[in-house]
């Protein structure tokens, strides 16, 4: 093998795998062994040729001089033939060497081709992996940048402030009043409205006394549902002539109600003090509804011992006298006393719990009024009689 071939093989070894390198070395070793064998055969063939030429010369000396010329010619012919034979022998050896080198070259070319194919396949396999890795690395950046672009477009365009407000659960408060109380502006972004929805619900509860609960929920894409729960009306306050609703938390709503809008049966409070109204509502919260629904009017009737004494007139004409601060304790006992009452009675719960007939009280009141009238009539003539005497005394003086 020439130096050029060796240089080419060295360059190719860089691209071959470990197994291919070993196989290539094995082939080179084989080719070297074959070359050494051919060299030995050539060396062995040279002494044989010299021995044959010496034998022919000895036989030629024993013959006649005449035959020397012919033998010399024959020897010359033999030498030419031997040279030709040696050349013929060398030619197949060279052919064998060339064939072995050709085979090795073919094999190396095959291995080189296989190596190139393997390298190409590996390159093809590696290329998509590298591309995927770069894609995976760039994916977060692409996602974040695209989201930022979409958000900027959303806030710049009027789509960012579109809102559809839906109010449910309202009976006494209009939809416009509720939306106004939330303080949601039409220019507010949909996103900020979603983030501050709890604050808007608190604004609604603070601004409107009717609202007990408020909840704002979001429905994609632009709908906000305002669910409200209103306080129930417990009674009506009518101490000033106008009738105002009293809701279940004890607040007197400063919106007069027309008599035509009043229900058939309702609790009428004749209490001008709003603090006492709130206290009454708190006390009645522990009283059963069966008793509360039977109360027709509530009047403040203080006594010398109890300043917050109330008189509750029931729908069946019974009356209950009870202190405001003891309603939650004593008024529930009315359900036990009520079955024992056969006629309109007064149930006194100021000091204890006892009842007496209302007719007797009315009779006593009537008797007291008559006595007052009689006493007033008796005192009037005395005064008239005393008047002239006073006049005479003055004249005498």
From Swiss-Prot:
Keywords of this entry: Cell cycle, Cell division, Cell membrane, Membrane, Transmembrane, Transmembrane helix
Any single biological process term in GO: FtsZ-dependent cytokinesis
PROSITE patterns: POTRA
Transmembrane segments: 139-159
Biased composition range(s): Basic and acidic residues: 24-37
Main location: membrane
Keyword tRNA processing (UniProt): no
Extracellular side: 160-397
InterPro entries: DivIB (IPR026580), FtsQ_DivIB (IPR050487), POTRA (IPR034746), POTRA_FtsQ_type (IPR013685)
Subcellular localization, as worded in the UniProt entry: Cell membrane
Ranges for domain POTRA: 160-231
Protein's membrane topology: Single-pass type II membrane protein
Disordered as annotated region, ranges: 24-115, 360-397
Record's compositionally biased regions (Acidic residues): 74-103, 366-377
GO cellular component, one term: plasma membrane
Superkingdom of origin: Bacteria
Any Pfam family hit: POTRA_1
Cytoplasmic side: 1-138
Function description: Cell division protein that may be involved in stabilizing or promoting the assembly of the division complex.
Protein family per UniProt: Belongs to the FtsQ/DivIB family. DivIB subfamily.
Protein name per UniProt: Cell division protein DivIB
Organism of provenance: Streptococcus gordonii (strain Challis / ATCC 35105 / BCRC 15272 / CH1 / DL1 / V288)
């Amino acid at each position: 093998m020439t130096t050029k071939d060796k240089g080419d093989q060295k360059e190719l070894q860089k691209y071959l795998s470990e197994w291919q390198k070993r196989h290539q070395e094995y082939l080179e070793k084989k080719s070297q062994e074959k070359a050494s064998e051919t060299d030995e055969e050539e060396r062995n063939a040279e002494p044989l040729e010299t021995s044959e030429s010496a034998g022919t010369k000895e036989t030629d000396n024993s013959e006649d001089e005449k035959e020397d010329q012919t033998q010399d010619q024959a020897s010359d012919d033999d030498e030419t033939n031997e040279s030709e034979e040696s050349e013929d022998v060398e030619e197949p050896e060279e052919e064998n060497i060339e064939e072995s080198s050709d085979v090795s070259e073919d094999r190396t070319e095959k291995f080189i081709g296989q190596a190139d194919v393997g390298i190409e396949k590996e390159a093809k396999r590696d290329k998509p992996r590298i591309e995927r890795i770069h894609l995976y690395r760039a994916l977060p950046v692409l996602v974040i940048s695209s989201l930022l672009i979409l958000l900027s477009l959303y806030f710049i365009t009027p789509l960012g402030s579109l809102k559809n407000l839906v109010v449910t659960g309202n009976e006494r408060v209009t939809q416009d009043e509720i939306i106004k109380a939330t303080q949601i502006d039409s220019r507010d972004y949909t996103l900020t409205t979603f983030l501050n929805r709890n604050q808007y619900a608190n604004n609604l509860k603070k601004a409107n006394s009717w609202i007990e609960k408020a909840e704002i929920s979001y429905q994609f894409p632009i709908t906000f549902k305002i669910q409200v729960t209103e306080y129930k009306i417990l009674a009506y306050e009518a101490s000033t002539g106008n009738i105002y609703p009293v809701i279940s938390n004890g607040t007197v709503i400063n919106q007069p109600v027309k008599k035509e809008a009043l229900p058939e049966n309702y609790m009428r409070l004749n209490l001008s003090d709003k603090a006492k109204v709130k206290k009454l509502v708190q006390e009645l919260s522990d009283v059963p509804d069966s008793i509360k629904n039977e109360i027709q009017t509530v009047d403040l009737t203080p006594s010398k011992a109890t300043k917050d004494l109330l008189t509750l007139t029931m729908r069946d004409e019974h009356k209950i006298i009870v202190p405001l601060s003891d309603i939650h304790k004593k008024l529930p006992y009315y359900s036990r006393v009520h079955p024992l009452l056969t006629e309109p009675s007064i149930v006194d719960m100021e000091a204890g719990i006892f009842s007496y007939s209302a007719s007797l009280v009315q009779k006593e009141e009537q008797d007291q009024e008559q006595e007052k009238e009689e006493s007033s009539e008796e005192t009037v003539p005395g005064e008239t009689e005393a008047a002239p005497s006073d006049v005479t005394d003055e004249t005498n003086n």
